[in-house]
Amino acid sequence: MKKNIWVIFLLLLSNIVFAQDNLTVVAIGQATLEKTEVAIVASKRSFGGSENIKNANEIMAIIKNDLSFYKKKFSVKATEVSQATDASDWKSKGADFLIVLEMTSAQPLSVKATTYSVKENRSLSEKMSSNSNLRRVAHDLADNSFRAITGDPSIFNSKILFVSDRDTRRGDNIKELYLMDFDGGNKTQLTRHRGMVISPDISFDGRKVVYSLIKEGRSSKRNIDLYLMDLDTKESKLISSRPGINSGAIFMPDGVNIALTLSHEGNAEIYLMDMNTQKLKRITNHYSPDVDPSFNKAGDKMAFLSGRSGMPMIYMMDPRSQEKDVRRISYVGEFNATPRFSPDGKEIAFSSWLDNRFDIFRLDSDGNNLVRLTKDFGSNEDPTYSNDNEFIAFSSQRVLSRTKAVHNIYIMDREGEIFGSITDNYGNCITPRWSK
């Protein structure tokens, strides 16, 4: 009975309110670095008319905001609607790179971005983006320019999955699933179950979502069932309703299997399940409950939570065989929650209960080099890495008054510098999952 209590506790961890003081954020260890200077110009000739100029300014503002997430690399010198669209026009102004926007169609909106090296006076890339959604056009163009300048992928086209209780009414406990751009724009409600959605994950190709559902009602026999959603059609289907817990599911890199926690045989254990056939393969087999798996992209390492030491701590194993090479890797706090691999598999971010609150830590996948990322900033949970390894989204609860506290989704860089909330005034927002 005691084991089942803390299993349920872990599964519902992100739904519990922990009141904390409203504290000031201080960036730790921020160094002064030489930054790349970027200018963004919308061609006045192509963006003729007041409405088009309004769109041009909005696109430039989004591109500038996108680049600001990499503020240790970039400084945006200017954004303006201008006829000065030649790279040579900006050399004397100190710009290293110039992004020139030209509108080719208003309906649907089509914009071309040309990225120039000002010093070399040459074009690095051209990108045409067409979409009725202006924000998607802007993010797409920003991503192309970022890649042209750095040679690396960006986060600008990525999405974040999350859960919010904004539909909750008095007496209800409603939590539904939502999807948004990485910066908090284009929020879209995905589910309308009128129940409690928990433990979501998004597939590697960004086309499917898996989540668990506790249906509304007061029955003590309520099951925790597992659903799979197609993001193209927004249709969900039940894929596991075994007795007890069907939760904590994550997509495997092979696109065929998911890993999840099941308790249908009595104890909570981690399994692989084929999404098409629902065939199971058991990975853990221990008298202590094992929950919340996370895999590296190669599929040869699995981090998970286990109470083998008495309280939930992070363990690592080779998931290719049952109970292979199991070893404990975390020793911080009273207990841990939600371990998540970085995309490159080198690090694990997790939350730990320490000093009467949750804070977020990261450590190398071998258990070395522990780094505390949050401190004196509410109660911080559910870390999830960006697709480029550079950022971590997480949920944090702040006290607004004596009677009100709210969870929001925040973004910080991997060193712990926090950028701010991306879900203000959207209910309690928890369990973020960044697209791969």
What are the roles of these predicted feature ranges?
Residues K119, D181-G185, D230-K234, D274-Q278, ...:
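Short loop/turn segments that connect beta-strands within beta-propeller blades
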Residues Q20-T36, R122-S125, S129-Q189:
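C-terminal/domain-edge helix-coil "capping" segments
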Residues S154-F156, F204-D205, P253-D254, K297-A298, ...:
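Residue-level detector of Asp-centered blade-edge/turn motifs that repeat once per structural unit
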Residues Q83-N144:
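Amphipathic beta-strand/beta-sheet edge segments enriched in Tyr/Trp
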Residues P153, S164-E176, R192-G195, L213-D225, ...:
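A flexible loop/linker signature enriched in serine peptidases of the S9 family
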Residues D21-W90:
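Short beta-strand->alpha-helix linker/helix-N-cap micro-motif
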Residues I160, V209-V210, G255-A259, M302-A303, ...:
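Hydrophobic beta-strand positions that form the internal "hydrophobic ladder"
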